[in-house]
Amino acid sequence: MENVGTEISTVSREEVLPVLATAKIARPRAAALAARPARPRPARRRFPARTLHLVDIENLAGAAIPSPGQVSEVQGRYVTSPGFGADDLVVMAASHLGLLNVALGWPHARYRVRSGPDGADLELLDVLWHEDVAARFTHVVIGSGDGVFGQAAANLSERGVRVTVVSRRDSLATSLARVAMDVVYLDTSQAAAA
């Protein structure tokens, strides 16, 4: 057999790409989609809009071991200040000595326990640093006035999370107030823009 008229030639990639780019390929679905008016798409989030409340009850109550009555009083003020939604998550932190009082005074929360200096703060920071809060929540309320939360709050703000601080007026660190979008004082129940 004789190979009549068959000649193999090499074509470079640079020669093929312009031809492919201008070639019209029949794509009925693509044409239908292109003809449809463009709608603005909301940013896709993996989780629905939710709020995380991180509560250092010892700081808000102003006591190392708050009584159930003090915890209930703080809860009453706190719940009316930033407002709660049905899907909000409350994480409370306290020492092992105050855990029972906290659970009795503010039921239906997730409790974290650590004793020692700044134990409650460290537990709440552990939640912020290790639980991908920015991907799961659109709003974080920090129930503490301790400045140790300043860096974590700034990181959340940079990632598009709204940060609110709930604190007693006399225990709010300036560094934390600066990075928060909103500040709510429990003792006066007035919000001040930070």
Regions found by a protein language model. Give the residues of each.
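Nuclease catalytic cores that cleave nucleic-acid phosphodiester bonds
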Residues: H96-A194
